[in-house]
Amino acid sequence: MGKYAFIDKVTLTGPPPRVIENPTGQGAKNPVRFSAYVFIPSGIDLSKKHPLLVLPHGGVHSNFNTFYRHILRELKAQQYVVVAPEYRGSTGYGKGFYELIDYGGLEVEDTYASRNYMLENYDFIDKNRVGILGWSHGGLITLHNIFEHPKDYQVAYAGVPVSDLIARMGYKTQGYRDLYSADYHIGKSAYEDVEEYRRRSPVWNAYKLQTPLLIHTNTNDGDVNVFEVEHLIKSLKAEDKEFEYEIYEDIPGGHSFDRIDSQKAKEVRAKVYQHLARYLNPNQPIRSIRDLHQASYLPR
């Protein structure tokens, strides 16, 4: 990857923590510092403007890792600039950062801050060609970004997005629920504070949609049950919103069905890239599966 792109890891800031144990302590309300990976395709003409994609990773707690390597190669081949934020709660940065998690909350603003950082620091990025895409937890962050900042994104893709935290708490294990009700996180269960879980759920914010959006889900998803995403789709339709979606039937790969390296996964990703390209107009769009295959091993 490094041969075909400039890669950097930068440090930036988001809002102060939501939960502050000692509000009067020195620096207690300082902005949260977090990292983000920056990927700039080599050989692009820096005298011209280029589109930006924001790519938040999944979770609950995770980080941006090599699972996204082929997706990055495919985005690089299209000459997208990419920023991948390691928003609060990401792993690999110690217990304190882990416990800053704010699922469906301030992590959304960290991601938005990474978008703004790119526009402020790289003058070859076109502010009118900015998109966002993510899967699972990253899909939830994608949805909240376009709901809260609709004028700042021209297009979005949400793959198997976590959509309804209340429903999700009903079918997940107690250990999973404990991640949310922990004192350092939400501090209450969905039963104890329904409104707080609604606030963090895209399905209850569907009325805010203004940005062109594509949603994909899979009926055999073992992580984000398809009924969560169906609830989101129904909510968007009830609000008479314009968007695109596809519910895939039992595609191998389950939750990761369009992120693995199978032929079907590549076909689905090609649809995603075509959706993004309609609004971002990259220099070298992927128009076929052949283009996508070549992105894995040939410079474009």
Regions found by a protein language model. Give the residues of each.
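Cap/lid segment of the alpha/beta-hydrolase catalytic domain
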Residues: G2-N128, L133-W135, G170, S256
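Active-site-proximal cap/loop segments of hydrolase catalytic domains
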Residues: P16, N22, Y87-R300
